[in-house]
A protein has these predicted regions:
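Generic recognition of stable, solvent-exposed alpha-helical segments in well-folded globular domains
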Residues: 9, 13-20, 42, 155, ...
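A generic short-segment signal for beta-strand/edge and adjacent turn/coil regions
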Residues: 5-9, 129, 148, 156-158, ...
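Non-catalytic, mostly N-terminal accessory regions of nucleic-acid modification and defense proteins
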Residues: 1-196, 255-268
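Hydrophobic alpha-helical scaffolding
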Residues: 129, 150, 204, 232-236, ...
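N-terminal hydrophobic or amphipathic segments with adjacent small-residue motifs
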Residues: 21, 34, 200-202, 237, ...
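Conserved S-adenosyl-L-methionine
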Residues: 175-279, 284-294, 300
């Protein structure tokens, strides 16, 4: 009698496993907060893994004396992780009742140590949620099992971010996923404009997907990412932070303005002469300006002022 063929069960992709683990938070926090609970922790783990990798390189290079010198990390585009932000320390604190406060402290110290992360990480966030310590510790344990540096394509964390952002957009429903534009659409837009070099601007950048895909386009065509400068602006504070984390994880230097702000009413790049404007604006915004506001704005000089009833024309002229 012939033996039955053994069924080989392929392991689930890491992003799927993480999503399933994160689902256990449902009911404990609002869906609108859910993404920030998870993505900030994934970012912290990724930053620590890169730090540990660089630390080992320094030891192998005979530079152990410089293990705590931040310059030897930032020069390689690696975030320097202060003691308070070390993942190993956080895991030791996972059984403590004030775990949420330790996570907040870790994120605050990481942002303070690294200039490029200013404004990117949540502040005093986890303690304010009142999240059950056991659920938070369980999520930490699952993320702890992930080696974020072993992806064959070298972009595991980018994949996790894209997967989660897409899932969050679906989970939050129509009108609640403005921070995410499907990457198939972004890819098509990028292929159409071919941004090999110059300044790219997205006035409503969401989570930064336009910039990420632009860099992927350059890599696919053997271009030089240093020939591209990235500028953007985002209105929603939490989405602004997502964008900064998303771009930092990819090593993309960007100027998203000093803080989240309305592009129409507080343009943070008034003198920018962009070579490419790549955007998916929130269409059909009503009452986006008052009757006497922005009437003589220089962005539509020589054209009729966009109507107050719909911002579409304003986005085109922007």
């Amino acid at each position: 009698m012939a033996k039955k063929a053994t069924k080989i069960i392929e392991p689930k992709p890491i992003e799927v496993t993480l999503w399933e683990s994160a689902n256990k938070l449902r009911g404990a926090v609002e869906p609108s907060e859910y993404k920030h609970v998870v993505l900030s922790l994934i970012f912290l783990k990724y930053a620590n893994d890169k730090f540990d990798e660089r630390r080992q390189e320094l030891i192998e290079e005979g530079k152990a004396a410089f293990l705590d010198n931040a310059v030897f990390y930032t020069a390689k585009n690696v975030f320097y992780i202060p003691e308070t932000s070390r993942w190993s320390r956080l895991m030791q604190e996972a059984k403590q009742a004030d775990l949420a406060f330790h996570i907040d402290a870790a994120l605050a110290a990481l942002e303070l140590e690294n200039e490029s992360l200013r404004g990117a990480l949540p502040s005093n966030y986890y303690a304010s949620l009142g999240l059950d310590r056991t659920k938070l510790a369980t999520l930490l344990d699952r993320i702890n099992e992930v080696d974020t540096l072993t992806a064959a394509d070298g972009d595991l964390m980018g994949r996790v971010y894209e997967y989660f952002l897409g899932k969050f957009a679906i989970a939050e429903g129509k009108g609640k996923g403005e921070f995410y534009t499907p990457k198939t659409i972004v890819r098509l837009m990028t292929e159409l404009i071919e941004p090999y070099s110059g300044r790219i601007y997205d006035p409503c950048c969401g989570s930064g997907g336009m910039f990420v895909q632009s860099m992927k386009f350059i890599e696919a065509h053997q271009g030089n990412k240093l020939n591209i400068s990235v500028y953007g602006q985002e209105y929603t504070n939490t989405t602004y932070k997502l964008a900064k984390m998303n771009l930092a994880i990819r090593g993309i230097t960007c100027n998203l303005g000093a803080q989240a702000a309305d592009t129409f009413h507080r343009d943070q790049h008034p003198d920018l002469k962009a070579d490419f404007i790549l955007a998916n604006p929130p269409f059909n915004q009503k009452a986006w300006r008052g009757a006497n506001e922005l009437v003589d704005d220089p962005r539509w000089m020589g054209f009729p002022s966009p109507p107050t009833s719909n911002a579409n024309y304003g986005w085109i002229l922007n």
